[in-house]
C-alpha cells in the first residue's frame, strides 16, 4: 500500500512546477519557502550518478569541509594515545581514549557524530565494526578519519565537514546546511559539493555522468536543479 503524504507536504508540492528544472538560486529560495517543519530543517542535495557501483573504482566515498558549515554542533571522539591524544584534546575533541573508549562503545554508548582514529589504534577500533559500520561512524582513511593528523581531522569535523558515498544505485545524498541559513550560504555550500562530485568523476564512466540533481528540506518535496547553475 502506497504511503499517502500529509496535507502540508501536498500543499508544498503544489508550489513546485512539475518537470521544471530550476536554477540554483530559484531552487534554494523555493525549498526555503515551502519548508513546513516546526524545527530548523536540514537541506540536502541528491545526485543520481551514472556509475557502476559493482566496480570498485566507481564507488565514490570521501569528505569535504563546507565553506559555510553545516549549522550543526558536532560531537567528535578520537581513538588515540600519547602525544596524539594530547593533540586531539587540544584541537577540541569531545572525548579521547584508547581501550577504555572502545569498551565504552561496546557497552552501548553512541552519543557522538564523528569518530576519528590514529592508524595504530585501528586493531582495537576494528572490533567495533559491527556497531559503528552500519551507522556510518567507522573511521575510514577515505574520509580522513583514520589519520596521524588528528588536529586537522578534529578541526574539519568541528567546522563543517560532510561525508559522501554512493549507494548501490549510484545515488549520493549530502546535507549542506539548515533552512535558516541565508540563501548565499546555502549556495556556497551547494556549489562546493557539486564541484567535488564533478571533479571525482571515475575515468571509466562513459556518457552523462550526473544524470539528475535535486534539493529538499528534511520533510519537504524535492526540487530539481540544473547542474550547470551549480558550476557557474
Swiss-Prot record:
The keyword Ligase is annotated on this UniProt entry: no
Membrane-crossing segments per the record: none
Alphabetical list of Gene3D superfamilies matching this protein: 3.30.190.20, 3.40.50.790
One term under GO cellular component: large ribosomal subunit
PROSITE patterns reported for this sequence: RIBOSOMAL_L1
Domain of life: Bacteria
GO molecular function, one term: rRNA binding
Cross-referenced SUPFAM superfamilies: Ribosomal protein L1
Single biological process term from Gene Ontology: translation
Keyword list, A-Z: Repressor, Ribonucleoprotein, Ribosomal protein, RNA-binding, rRNA-binding, Translation regulation, tRNA-binding
PANTHER family the UniProt entry points to: 54S RIBOSOMAL PROTEIN L1, MITOCHONDRIAL (PTHR36427), LARGE RIBOSOMAL SUBUNIT PROTEIN UL1M (PTHR36427:SF3)
Functional note: Binds directly to 23S rRNA. The L1 stalk is quite mobile in the ribosome, and is involved in E site tRNA release. Protein L1 is also a translational repressor protein, it controls the translation of the L11 operon by binding to its mRNA.
The protein's name: Large ribosomal subunit protein uL1
Gene that encodes it: rplA
Amino acid at each position: 500500500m502506497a504511503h499517502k503524504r500529509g496535507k502540508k507536504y501536498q500543499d508544498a508540492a503544489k508550489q513546485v512546477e512539475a518537470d521544471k528544472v530550476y536554477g540554483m538560486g530559484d531552487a534554494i529560495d523555493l525549498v526555503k519557502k515551502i519548508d513546513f517543519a516546526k524545527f530548523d530543517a536540514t537541506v540536502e542535495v541528491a545526485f543520481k550518478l551514472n556509475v557502476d557501483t559493482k566496480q570498485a573504482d566507481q564507488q565514490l566515498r570521501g569528505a569535504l569541509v563546507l565553506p559555510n558549515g553545516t549549522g550543526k554542533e558536532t560531537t567528535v571522539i578520537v581513538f588515540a594515545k600519547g602525544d596524539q591524544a594530547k593533540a586531539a584534546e587540544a584541537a577540541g575533541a569531545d572525548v579521547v581514549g584508547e581501550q577504555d573508549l572502545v569498551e565504552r562503545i561496546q557497552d552501548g554508548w553512541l552519543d557522538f557524530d564523528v569518530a576519528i582514529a590514529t592508524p595504530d589504534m585501528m586493531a582495537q577500533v576494528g572490533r567495533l565494526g559491527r556497531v559503528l559500520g552500519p551507522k556510518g561512524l567507522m573511521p575510514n582513511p577515505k574520509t580522513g578519519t583514520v589519520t596521524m593528523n588528528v588536529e586537522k581531522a578534529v578541526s574539519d569535523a568541528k567546522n563543517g565537514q560532510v561525508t559522501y558515498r554512493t549507494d548501490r544505485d549510484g545515488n549520493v545524498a549530502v546535507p549542506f546546511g539548515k533552512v535558516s541559513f541565508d540563501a548565499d550560504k546555502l549556495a556556497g555550500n551547494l556549489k562546493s559539493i557539486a564541484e567535488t562530485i564533478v571533479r571525482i568523476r571515475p575515468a571509466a564512466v562513459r556518457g552523462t555522468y550526473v544524470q539528475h540533481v535535486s534539493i529538499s528540506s528534511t520533510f519537504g518535496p524535492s526540487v530539481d536543479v540544473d547542474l550547470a547553475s551549480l558550476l557557474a
